[in-house]
Every structure is written in C-alpha cells, then in structure tokens.
C-alpha cells in the first residue's frame, strides 16, 4: 500500500530548504496544516524544509518538571526550542537535517500504517543504489523513539510522524543527512537531564544513548548534502510517474496559513513565554 500511495499523478512542490535563519519552525507546522486543509482540492504536495539550530519539542516535553532548565541547556548550545502541534518528543534540527512532508488527500481513507509505509518506500527508493539495509522499527536509546524509526545496522538516522487535518494527512520525516548523529543525541540527552533532574514522572521520557544515532553520511560512508537528497526525492517520485510543479500558496491558502501560524505562536507563547 505504501508504494501505491506514492503514485500520485501530480505533486505540488514547496522547497523551503534554503530560507535560512529567518524561517521559523512555527511556520513549518502552520504550512503543513494549511496544505492538509487544501489537499483535497489542490492535490498532493511534497514540502522540503530545513531549520537552523532548533529543537522541536512535543506536548509531553512541555510538561517536564524543570523545562526552563532544559531550555537553558539548549540556549547554551545555540539552539532555540519550538513546541510542535502534535505528539512526539524532542528532535534536533540543523543545516544537516532535511525534513520532508508528504501531504496526501484522505480519499477513501489512509490508515496510519499506510502513511508510514509510503514514506519508508520513498526513502528506500532514494538510497536504493547505496543500500538495501534500511530498516523500520524502534531504536531503543534514540531520541523521539517510535515504531517507524529508520536505521541502518541498528543506528537511527530518521524518524517519521503524521499529522491529520481536515481530510488531509501530512507524513513528515526528518533525515539526518550529514554531521554527527551522536552529537545531536548528546544535546537531547543533556536537555532531558536538566529538565528532569532525576525526578520520577508519570510519563516515561527516553533514556538517550548517543551511540544509537548517526547521519546517513556516517552510515553510508560517502559525502551527502541536503541538496543531493532533495534531488533524490524528486527523481524517485518522477520515476513513479508523477509530474512535479513548483508551487506557492493560493490566496485562500495564504489566509489559512496566517490563522494556523497565529495558533502556533499562541501555543508557543503559553509554554515558552
């Protein structure tokens, strides 16, 4: 089912990988909600995005007993926190992490596993020439662990999540393309250590083991860039028969984006001040 979901006739393309430091993660989450709401009429979309020195926190992270101390750790390393509008836990974003959102219409219903399988199929096609060893399954010791962690030889390089809004589904992945996967994990480990301070909580936060994470460049032992990976995304979709059209939001979508961004900013203001 996953590969079949990828076989859309047409994709709108939104490339937001080179917008720099002025492009804030709150804008990204508002963007995906906007595309989900219009996908039934405007068609499937693929959005790529990069954020610099950002740690995206989940709803449970916002309930950490010493959150302010954890945020101080992030600031000390030059990172800014953002609260996402869905579940999941802390994830590190920087210039070496490519994020991809696959936005599909829920015509006939898309079950949760099918959405994950579609993204897994895409990533496997992207790197089919380099490896056939990309596995899906929780990597214990990684940050934001889940059943659709992607790994090679037991080391996680990507995680997949989903967001469903108004008849559309956004399947989102972060791909650690280059840089040190273990250094990113060390940052998250330090964040949780400061935010928990040894306290027992009702929710069990991950015990991060930095050695469980790596970048694709480290795992494949060849130079990789975000730009190279983005070309692989587009090529893989075109090989499946899709036409790709660089796009911008319509007037209606722009208005909706403004509303969605306002909600994201309000959410972050309440938690982070």
UniProtKB/Swiss-Prot annotation:
Keyword Glycosyltransferase (UniProt): no
Recorded metabolic or biological pathway in which this protein acts: Protein modification; protein lipoylation via endogenous pathway; protein N(6)-(lipoyl)lysine from octanoyl-[acyl-carrier-protein]
InterPro entries the UniProt entry points to: aa-tRNA-synth_II/BPL/LPL (IPR045864), BPL_LPL_catalytic (IPR004143), LipL (IPR024897), Octanoyltrans_LipM/LipL (IPR050664)
Residue ranges of every copy of the BPL/LPL catalytic domain listed in the record: 40-245
Active site residues according to the UniProt entry: 144 (acyl-thioester intermediate)
Gene3D superfamilies, per database record: Bira Bifunctional Protein, Domain 2
Reaction equation(s) it catalyzes: N(6)-octanoyl-L-lysyl-[glycine-cleavage complex H protein] + L-lysyl-[lipoyl-carrier protein] = N(6)-octanoyl-L-lysyl-[lipoyl-carrier protein] + L-lysyl-[glycine-cleavage complex H protein]
Annotated family: Belongs to the octanoyltransferase LipL family.
Additional information: The reaction proceeds via a thioester-linked acyl-enzyme intermediate.
Stated name of the protein: Octanoyl-[GcvH]:protein N-octanoyltransferase
Species this protein is from: Exiguobacterium sibiricum (strain DSM 17290 / CCUG 55495 / CIP 109462 / JCM 13490 / 255-15)
């Amino acid at each position: 089912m996953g590969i079949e979901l990828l076989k859309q006739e047409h994709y709108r393309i939104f490339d937001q990988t080179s917008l720099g430091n002025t492009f804030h993660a709150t804008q990204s989450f508002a963007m995906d909600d906007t595309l989900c709401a219009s996908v039934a009429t405007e068609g499937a979309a693929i959005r790529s995005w990069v954020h610099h020195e950002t740690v995206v926190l989940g709803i449970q992270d916002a309930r950490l007993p010493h959150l302010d101390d954890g945020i101080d750790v992030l600031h000390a390393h030059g990172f800014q926190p953002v609260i996402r509008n869905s579940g999941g836990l802390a994830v590190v974003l920087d210039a070496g992490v490519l994020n991809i959102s696959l936005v599909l219409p829920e015509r006939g219903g898309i079950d949760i596993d099918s959405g994950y399988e579609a993204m897994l199929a895409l990533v496997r096609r992207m790197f089919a020439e380099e490896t056939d060893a990309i596995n899906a399954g929780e990597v214990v010791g990684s940050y934001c662990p889940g059943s659709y962690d992607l790994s090679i030889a037991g080391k996680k390089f990507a995680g997949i999540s989903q967001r469903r809004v108004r008849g559309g589904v956004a399947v989102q992945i972060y791909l650690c393309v280059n840089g040190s996967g273990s250094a990113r994990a060390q940052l998250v480990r330090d964040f949780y250590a400061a935010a928990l301070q040894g306290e027992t909580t009702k929710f069990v936060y991950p015990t991060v083991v930095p050695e469980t994470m790596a970048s694709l460049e480290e795992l494949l032992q060849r130079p990789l860039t975000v730009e190279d990976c983005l070309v692989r995304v587009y090529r893989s979709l075109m090989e499946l028969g899709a036409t790709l059209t660089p796009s911008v939001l319509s007037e209606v979508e722009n208005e909706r984006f403004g509303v969605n961004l306002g909600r994201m900013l309000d959410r972050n203001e309440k938690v982070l001040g």
